């Protein structure tokens, strides 16, 4: 079971790892065999190697990342959050604005074993 404070700390660490593109911090948030569903209909990324590659891909195409949690909740072992993000695209600097919702199933060691997100892009922004 994850409590509200621990969920907030996990989300802060998630945002910080994305903003700094810290691969070790990023994969440290997930179990070794974690599933990361960027799209509810797509094939998930599975495991630390896939997660690190995903972050490296983001680092190659994004800069000036901002990540803000609007609100979060917990239900048993599940963390739920509404969030907003923005970043500039490399090259060119086109700005992207996103809003989303995520769920993370948190294992007993505090790492996510399954992560799902649903994302909307603001009209008129590059994504």
Whereabouts are the PLM-identified features?
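Structured beta->alpha junctions
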Residues: 15, 40, 71-73
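Short, low-complexity N-terminal intrinsically disordered segments enriched in polar/charged residues
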Residues: 1-32, 126-127
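Secondary-structure boundary/capping signal
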Residues: 22, 34, 63-66
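A short gly/proline-enriched turn/hairpin at secondary-structure junctions
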Residues: 35-45, 60
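Short hydrophobic/aromatic segments of transmembrane alpha-helices and their interfaces
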Residues: 33-34, 95
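Hydrophobic pocket/interface hotspot
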Residues: 14, 26-27, 34, 47, ...
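Generic, well-ordered alpha-helical segments
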Residues: 43-46, 50, 64
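A beta-strand edge to alpha-helix "cap/lid" segment located at domain peripheries
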Residues: 1, 6, 52-127
């Amino acid at each position: 079971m994850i409590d509200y404070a621990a969920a907030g700390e996990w989300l802060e660490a998630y945002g910080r790892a994305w903003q700094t593109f810290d691969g070790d911090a990023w994969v440290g948030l997930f179990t070794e065999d974690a599933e990361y569903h960027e799209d509810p209909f797509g094939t998930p990324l599975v495991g630390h190697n896939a997660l690190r590659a995903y972050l490296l891909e983001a680092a190659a195409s994004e800069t000036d990342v901002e990540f803000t949690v609007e609100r979060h909740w917990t239900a048993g072992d599940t963390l739920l959050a509404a969030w907003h993000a923005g970043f500039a695209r490399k090259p060119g600097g086109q700005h992207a604005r996103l809003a989303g919702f995520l769920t993370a199933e948190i294992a007993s060691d505090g790492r996510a074993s399954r992560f799902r997100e649903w994302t909307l892009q603001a009209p008129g922004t590059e994504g």
